[in-house]
Amino acid sequence: MSKGLHRTLSSTKRKVVAITAALTLPLGGMLAFASTSQADEAATTPTVTDDTGTTATGAINVGYFTEWDVYRGYHVKNIVDSGSADKITHLNYAFGYVQYGECRMGDEYAAHERFYSAAESVSGEDDTGALRGNINQLRQLKEINPDLKVLWSFGGFTWSNNIGEAMQNPHRFAQSCYNLVNDPYWDGVFDGIDLGWEFPNTCRDNCDESDPDAFADMMRAFRDVFGDQLVTAAITADGSDGGKIDATDYAAGAEYADYLTVKTYDYFGDWSPTGPTAPHSPLESYDGIPVDGFNGAAAISKLKAQGVPSEKLLLGIASHGRGWTGVSDAAPGGAASGPAPSTREAGIEDYKVLAANCPATGTIAGTAYAHCGSQWWSYDTPQTVTAKMAWAKEQGLGGASFWELSGDSADGALVNAIHTTLNN
């Protein structure tokens, strides 16, 4: 077996780690528990070529597919069946993790060992070759969508804690990632790497001691090693004064990136269990918002002010809602008794479930909310996504990034709203 596979740990051990991460943390996009205390917390790259996977209009539409989706009954074939495979320009496979200064595989079983039957597979045929699992399904997806770009995402909310340590030797870190992403075992599947270092030079459950230049150093190292392949990153959307955007020089890092995903969601949620209720993905501020600067427009404005080119910024859209129970007030700002019950984990639910069981009853700050009995949820709908994409076009942004595909409706309503608006 190849060197890249030898560097990973055993399949069984990885499977346990991946499932645990999926069950215990909100799928990688949260801002450091998003409490009010959060606010207290140069060589030139080659020009991005035409081989970036953009649409005819130049708009980028990224969809995340998570490795642990297989344990929730969602597979690459579902992306095809929903129609979303024809609408996204890039697919990020999330997540690998970082340990001992290197990129590591998250779950070997899900990634390349799980057998797919004809009924489950993109090709409609049983697995017969040595390469199986998600990666083989992604290979089949690219065969029917040859313009689709597939990137391997590393880090995220759970697994980015060790990136600061890895940055003690940026080139070694980047080379290890290159070797895994481009392992001959899955040659041609991946077109580059996406780096989910969400909180450089800031504190979360531990404190990253990188300096403000560390993000740029990382992106430079990855560009040097990956060459013409895609190099992207998912970054914080904390637009508060003195917040997480201010802690890092994102403009310097953007020089080496094809684009940056701004994770403009998970601003508010049940980590404040008694409320106040607030929309987790506000595009703009509103009277009574719990933390100034916790909205998409503030984040984009701050990144532009740093010098990040508009066309390298993607607006984040989430397929999940966040909610509370014990709420009597229909409008935002009400008290609660705790996280709302869910088919997933308390306080977070897929759009496809909420649209059917708790339809939106109002909008605020460019997103939707719903009051159903004693439950209060906020989430985006096709209508609010359409408005957000219109705003993104007005701002000259490069497109959108969607976390994540399994939460969308069976007909891909949210992805379709992104695609339709960006390309009209």
Which ranges hold each PLM region?
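Conserved, mostly hydrophobic/aromatic
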Residues: 91, 152, 195, 222, ...
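Short, acidic/polar
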Residues: 69-85, 166-186, 239-251, 296, ...
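N-terminal secretory signal peptides that target proteins for export/translocation
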Residues: 1-12
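Extracellular low-complexity, Gly/Ser/Thr-rich intrinsically disordered linkers
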Residues: 69, 352-424
